[in-house]
């Protein structure tokens, strides 16, 4: 069995980790498995994600094939099923402290760094570096950049993401 360990930096109310999990379930062939750690500083947001229930108004961009496979339509919304919920662990975490996670393959931290000053950003980025395994990836938001920061990450040019790779 091959295992992909994926770190999700910001859970919010779970939409992003569930979306990533659905895509991975769709594209990863057997024998690959994965586990997502979805973290946030808001306990209220984490509770929404753990429940896995979303009103129809929040389901907008999910492809029909994913809704049919990973959700059950209920009165007023959709409930994530165990196939997808079992891939995600929701955890309270403040990015200003070390998570203790190591050898992650991917970290998604979109639209969070913009809320920190440069010193705090660098501190968070260094913690991400320590959490990632060799040749692992860091995705950040389009409005964010590591440009001009003294980091060891290598920018990978793509048309679709702000992507960095950990190089040793």
Where do the protein language model's features map onto the residues?
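Extended basic-aromatic, gly/pro-enriched interface segments that bind polyanionic ligands
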Residues: 32-108, 112-115, 120-123, 146-147
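Short conserved AdoMet
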Residues: 29, 54, 133
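A short glycine-rich, Lys/Arg-flanked "PGG" loop and its adjoining helix->strand segment in the class I
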Residues: 122-134
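Short, well-ordered alpha-helices that flank and scaffold nucleotide-derived cofactor binding pockets
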Residues: 22-26, 51, 130
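Core SAM-dependent methyltransferase catalytic element
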Residues: 106, 149-168
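Conserved class I S-adenosyl-L-methionine
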Residues: 2-14, 35-37
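Conserved beta-strand signature within the Rossmann-like core of class I S-adenosyl-L-methionine
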Residues: 134-142
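Conserved SAM-binding loop of SAM-dependent methyltransferases across substrates and taxa
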Residues: 13-30
């Amino acid at each position: 069995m091959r295992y992909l360990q994926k770190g999700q930096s910001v859970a919010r109310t779970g939409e992003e980790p569930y979306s990533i999990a659905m895509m991975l379930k769709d594209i990863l062939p057997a024998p690959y498995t994965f586990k997502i750690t979805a973290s946030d500083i808001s306990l209220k947001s984490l509770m929404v994600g753990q429940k896995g229930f979303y009103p129809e108004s929040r389901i907008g961009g999910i492809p029909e094939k994913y809704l049919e496979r990973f959700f059950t339509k209920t009165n007023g919304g959709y409930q994530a099923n165990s196939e997808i919920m079992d891939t995600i662990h929701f955890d309270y975490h403040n990015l200003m402290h070390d998570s203790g996670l190591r050898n992650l393959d991917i970290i998604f931290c979109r639209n969070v760094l913009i809320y920190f000053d440069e010193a705090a950003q660098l501190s968070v980025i260094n913690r991400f570096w320590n959490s990632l395994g060799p040749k692992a990836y860091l995705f950040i938001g389009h409005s964010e950049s590591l440009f001009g920061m003294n980091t060891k990450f290598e920018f990978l040019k793509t048309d679709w993401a702000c992507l960095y790779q950990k190089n040793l």
